[in-house]
């Protein structure tokens, strides 16, 4: 083996070892033990204020709950946390919720039970939508607070006494489905602390969504690469085909967008439809696009769809009379592009929009529909 080959072999293995070390080199969170002091923090709330442990210095009991916008289990407990906060506020109990997931580590494929991600801006929307009566704090992507407390899943509740010593760590209650539990485990722990007693049990296991630690972003990148590699196609569709599409003989909620490459608003908003499709495609949902470009412009339409990585069902209207398309889609449609429909099986129109959509509104409609839902 010559010297040059030896040199490059050594370099190759050196970089390989570095890469392996970087993959394995991440903090291993350990759950805070009973009796330990609450780690301090300095976090921004959805109300714009900065909170630290000292912000709750007068609390007779401090409840810290690690939660997440996107998590079905966490969402199932939101109303219970609001009710629990209202019940104990007058007793000197402070309740705080912290969102600690790393947003780059959350794939769109994990957002099938929500209208929102876990970013700070999305937290503000959830805080307002649900009228949270407790501070909702953002741990940011460095996750320092979560690493200090070591939550197992979301939601994970911690109860500290007046001296900020941990007395309880675990679940809120044993019944995830809304309406089947009232936060019994957490309430019992708070009652015990207020009475100067030790909660029994002091710890429980925690069922919920795994924490999205920053080192998990590799999985998100793998999913993005998988989507990018999926084939994109566009097929001709006639007036009759459009009628059948709108009638929706499937067992899925169907979102249809009518667009064209020459329509500025259409091409500007198309990425939002891809996001929506990737969020809900594992649920009883499908996204379909229909191009109104001339049939001879089919390749141009396909080129655009490939740029968008639109691996959903795509069609181009192949009949000559565009007005028949308009009537086939929706007699109420006046003809301006873009046009969007959300259809139940059987063709009932849940939502229609002439002009650009509001993506958040569409997501709320989808996840709020009885066929989809926010909970398992």
Spell out what each predicted region is.
Residues 1-25:
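Bacterial Sec-dependent N-terminal signal peptides
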Residues 42-90:
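N-terminal, post-signal-peptide region of Sec/Tat-exported proteins
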Residues 42-62, 234-254, 274-279, 326:
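A short beta-strand-turn-helix
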Residues 60-62, 67-70, 252-254, 259-262, ...:
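Short pre-active-site segment immediately N-terminal to redox-active cysteine/selenocysteine motifs
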Residues 67-80, 258-275:
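Conserved redox-active cysteine motifs that mediate thiol-disulfide chemistry
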Residues 92-117, 132-142, 284-298, 310-321:
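Thiol-based oxidoreductase modules, predominantly thioredoxin-like and allied folds used
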Residues 115-159, 167, 302-337:
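Short, internal strand/loop/helix patches
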Residues 161-234, 337-376:
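Thiol-/selenol-based redox modules, centered on thioredoxin-like
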């Amino acid at each position: 083996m010559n010297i040059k080959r030896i040199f490059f072999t050594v370099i190759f293995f050196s970089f390989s070892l570095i890469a392996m070390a970087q993959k394995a080199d991440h903090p291993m969170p350990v759950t805070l033990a009973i009796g330990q002091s609450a780690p301090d923090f300095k976090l921004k709330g959805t109300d714009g204020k900065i909170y630290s442990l000292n912000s709750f210095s007068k609390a007779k009991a401090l409840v810290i709950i690690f939660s997440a916008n996107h998590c079905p289990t966490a969402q199932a407990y939101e109303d219970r946390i609001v009710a629990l906060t209202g019940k104990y506020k007058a007793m000197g109990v402070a309740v705080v919720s912290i969102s600690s997931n790393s947003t780059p580590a959350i794939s769109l494929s994990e957002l099938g039970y929500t209208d929102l991600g876990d970013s700070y801006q999305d937290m503000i929307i959830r805080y307002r939508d649900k009228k949270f009566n407790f501070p909702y704090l953002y741990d940011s992507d460095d996750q320092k607070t979560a690493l200090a407390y070591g939550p197992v899943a979301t939601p994970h509740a911690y109860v500290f006494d007046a001296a900020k010593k941990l007395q309880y760590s675990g679940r809120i209650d044993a019944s995830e489905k809304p309406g089947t539990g009232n936060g019994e485990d957490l309430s019992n722990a708070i009652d015990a602390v207020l009475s100067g007693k030790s909660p029994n049990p002091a710890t429980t296991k925690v069922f919920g969504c795994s924490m999205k630690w920053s080192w998990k972003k590799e999985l998100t990148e793998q999913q993005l690469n998988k989507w990018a590699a999926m084939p994109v196609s566009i097929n001709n569709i006639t007036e009759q085909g459009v009628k059948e599409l709108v009638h929706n003989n499937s067992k899925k909620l169907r979102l249809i967008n009518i667009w064209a490459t020459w329509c500025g608003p259409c091409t500007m908003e198309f990425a939002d439809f891809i996001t929506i499709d990737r969020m809900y495609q594992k649920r009883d949902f499908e996204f379909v696009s229909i191009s109104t470009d001339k049939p001879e412009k089919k390749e141009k339409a396909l080129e655009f769809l490939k740029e968008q990585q639109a691996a959903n069902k795509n069609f181009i209207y192949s009949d000559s009379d565009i007005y028949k398309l308009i009537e086939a889609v929706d007699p109420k449609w006046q003809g301006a592009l873009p046009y969007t429909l959300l259809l139940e099986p059987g063709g009932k129109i849940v939502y229609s929009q002439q002009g650009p959509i509001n993506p958040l509104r569409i997501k709320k409609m989808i996840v709020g529909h009885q066929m989809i839902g926010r909970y398992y």
